[in-house]
Amino acid sequence: MSSEVLAAGALARTRAVVSGSSAGIGHAIAERLLALGAEVHGVDVAPATLGGPRFHALAVDLLDDAAVDRVARELAFADALVHAAGVMAAAPLGALEAATGERLWKLHVDAASRLANAIVPAMAARGHGRVVLVGSRVAQGMPGRSQYAATKAAQVALVRSWAAEVAPRGVTINVVSPAATATAMLDDPRRASSAPRLPPLGRYIAPGEVAELVAFLLTPAAAAITGQDVRICGGASLPA
């Protein structure tokens, strides 16, 4: 079954920045935005996996503060910002590593903050903009994933705070929080101590489903949705 519901051209004339565009959910989002007519600037340290006249690849290490600040300033013209870059790490108490926690924080929280700090004020000055952070259902907490969950919970706090700042100026900011999604991250050895859980739906979330939801939040039809944590979890967040 196709997850596509938006009409062709729904994002024509939209200039979007998508971090993590070379793989996984970020790739699916960038690909869908291109199909809907957007101009996409893909930010990733990995080689680009998309092409075409409306796709612009920017090789940036999101763990490099100076590089992120520089590219954020260069992309201040953007109408939409999607921060989809992310990694998974899992470990129980007694096996937590400070370096892992710092890496997760820099990628999920600090990089998002640096990008938004340069791009969102410019959006607000123009009176229009859309921001989506790709979070996780795990933000509510899960055994063995405390460091990862903490950074995803921080994303929700960022979004709610930022949304309150810029709502009167035509900018919406939301989190989309998937449950386990069918990407290569499911097989990441860094999550070996905390295996993915199949949601009640009976299958993992498809990257295209996440991409379609993100794309909708970038459209004019989503103008009244801001400061929200929108879960796409196949029932995983429901009471057992």
Report residues per predicted region:
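Conserved glycine-rich cofactor-binding loop
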Residues: 22-23
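Short C-terminal tail/terminal secondary-structure segment
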Residues: 2-7, 226-240
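Conserved mid-core segment of classical short-chain dehydrogenase/reductases
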Residues: 88-102, 144-147, 185-189
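Catalytic loop of short-chain dehydrogenase/reductase
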Residues: 130-154, 159-168, 180
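Short, small/polar-rich loop/turn modules that mediate ligand/substrate recognition or access, typified
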Residues: 167, 172, 225-227
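Catalytic Tyr-X3-Lys loop
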Residues: 87, 94-114, 132, 155
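Alpha-helical segment proximal to the catalytic Tyr-Lys
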Residues: 121, 164-165, 223
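A conserved structural motif in NAD(P)-dependent oxidoreductases
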Residues: 199-210
